[in-house]
């Protein structure tokens, strides 16, 4: 059950009767085998079947598609970067990693970084995280996993395209490129549109939950990001929410899993007709 839940990034567990309600994997926070195996299954499920098919067929880094290389690179950066961030930020926090030995702190920081990518298990109490860690958690939950996977979120490739577009803009390049390949401007525009829609819904929904429930904005944002990214983590306030807010979170879960996916498919497969009118260009002052 837990292996399937991990691979499918579901986050459901049967450990409540053993370690207490809503304990998740907290009872195993000193067990490298349990956390390591679970984290590995989460990563495998979150990479996407397209990437794994490419890996099985090519079996060599140099022969992998540019897309697979992008996904693997961004995934590695997010996991390692997230683990280092949580290790440093929560190092002395007694509510999370503070009372653990060094090796256990590193293990749980790594697991925290992995599980935020739409898995939903937790080995440390999310309610005890610092405000900075909660903010970073929101970012990782909104990013999610990779396209064609069991994970939700914006997807790693979308974030990769946005970062590459930022690099091209800062360097004054006319094309967005990655490893000798140019990314079509339409894909860049799609990524920007999708990111802006998700950001708007996230900010607005967080404001609504915060206002209705009279909760700190960051705690509300954590719940909303968890719902939109189909993660399932909570700081502990979900059972106390009113039916209105719980209903909103349910809608956000559907949007996070079905809505964003459908939105992406509409961009990719939508019928496009050549413009019958070509308008003259105009200059707009930016910044």
PLM segments and residue spans:
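Membrane-proximal intracellular helices of multi-pass ion channels
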Residues: 1-287
């Amino acid at each position: 059950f837990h292996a399937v839940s991990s691979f499918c990034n579901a986050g459901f567990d049967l450990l409540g009767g053993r370690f207490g309600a809503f304990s998740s994997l907290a009872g195993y926070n000193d067990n490298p085998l349990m956390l390591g195996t679970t984290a590995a299954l989460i990563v495998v499920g979150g990479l996407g079947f397209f990437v794994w098919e490419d890996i099985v067929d090519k079996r060599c880094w140099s022969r992998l598609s540019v897309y697979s290389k992008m996904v693997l690179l961004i995934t590695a950066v997010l996991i390692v970067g997230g683990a280092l961030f949580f290790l440093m930020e929560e190092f002395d926090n007694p509510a999370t990693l503070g009372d653990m030995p060094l090796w256990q702190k590193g293990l749980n920081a790594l697991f925290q970084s992995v599980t935020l990518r739409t898995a939903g298990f937790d080995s440390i109490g999310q309610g005890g995280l610092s405000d900075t860690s909660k903010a970073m958690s929101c970012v990782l939950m909104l990013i999610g996993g990779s396209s064609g996977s069991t994970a939700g979120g914006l997807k790693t490739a979308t974030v990769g395209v946005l970062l590459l577009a930022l690099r091209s803009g800062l360097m004054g390049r006319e094309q967005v490129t990655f490893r000798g390949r140019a990314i079509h401007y339409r894909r860049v525009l799609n990524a920007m549109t999708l990111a802006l829609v998700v950001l708007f819904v996230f900010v607005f929904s967080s404001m609504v939950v915060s206002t209705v429930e009279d909760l700190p904005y960051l705690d509300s944002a954590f719940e909303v990001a968890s719902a939109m990214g189909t993660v399932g983590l909570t700081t502990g306030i979900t059972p106390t929410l009113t039916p209105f807010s719980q209903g909103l979170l349910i809608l956000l879960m559907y949007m996070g899993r079905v809505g964003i996916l459908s939105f992406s498919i509409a961009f990719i497969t939508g019928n496009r007709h050549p413009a019958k009118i070509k308008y003259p260009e105009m200059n707009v002052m930016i910044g």
